[in-house]
Amino acid sequence: ALFQRASCYARLVTYFGDVVYVTSVVDIEEAFTLGRTPKSEIVPKIYEDYDKAAEGLPEKYTGVSSLRATKGAALALKARFALYMGDWEIAADAAKKCMDLGLYKLHADYAELFLMTTKNSEESIFLLPRSIEYKVTLGNWTVMNEVSRNPGGWGAFAPSWDLLAAYECTD
């Protein structure tokens, strides 16, 4: 639950800044009285949730459960969120802890990284399963990924020009 809460609030804070922050169930009347919590108060709580999640999660799962959140996923997503927040030392520390687990490494051939045969490579830290056969597809991720990052922009489905320019164009 801590991993999920941290991940959801990290996304909300990244997109919107100050948001309503609750850690317990509220009834509808109370919900209408809640105001936004400053981003500066929420960010440390997100880091704390990722830390507690990392303490309680296993380093890895096997079989069907292999796509569940792990210690490495909590550390990696904490590092990613810290980068977005400009907290370089927190990001570096979380990334180092993830790397020190010794479970992940870069895939040897970048060209084959995104093939079906290499979909669960050692480079993958946290995966969202997708399978037409088992009817596990994008679902509502389409909506979430189309939330604008900035006015007039698209979410994760449309790369920025900077990302495009980071790749060598050979055609």
What does each model-identified segment do?
Residues 43, 50-52, 68-171:
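An aromatic- and glycine-enriched ligand-binding surface/loop that stacks and positions planar moieties
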